């Protein structure tokens, strides 16, 4: 494993393609779209990349394996908005099941046909279709007609489609829900 750290990124991409029967060309196409050239990858080792470049390389490798299922951990982290939009296109075109986690709520409007789960404090809630979430709001009280009820910091928060609440898409990050729950508790 230590010897893998000393090889060039382009060789790591080739290795994964060989091991998985993946498409090395697709990995390079995705990375080129994200502004990372093949020549650059031939000149760098993985530890020499920025956090965003490393995230892009790992995501491109995963997508290029064409596996039936892939798991992406925060694939948008450290990417600028333009690169995030390009990556979304590859995710929506992927012919397989993608499980990804993110805190960024603005992304969901681009993943309209996806199922969504929420995880707060180790508890998993869902599924709920993204199209149901687009106009949904967080209500900081128990609502009888809630789409979903979440328990966050010991408080029940309802996800509602009608009524007063904080629109999900108005939150930059789902982490903000903790701050809002605390504010609601004080009022």
What are these regions (language model features)?
Residues 90-103:
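Conserved catalytic loops of ABC-family nucleotide-binding domains
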Residues 63-68:
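A short, proline-enriched helix->beta-strand linker immediately N-terminal to the Walker B motif
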Residues 76-77:
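Short loop immediately C-terminal to the Walker-B catalytic DE motif
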Residues 144-187:
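C-terminal coupling/interaction segments
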Residues 1-52:
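ABC-family P-loop ATPase nucleotide-binding domains
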Residues 123-150, 164-168:
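Conserved beta-strand-loop-alpha-helix hinge in the C-terminal portion
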Residues 59:
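Hydrophobic anchor residue at the start of the ABC signature
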Residues 104-111:
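Conserved H-loop
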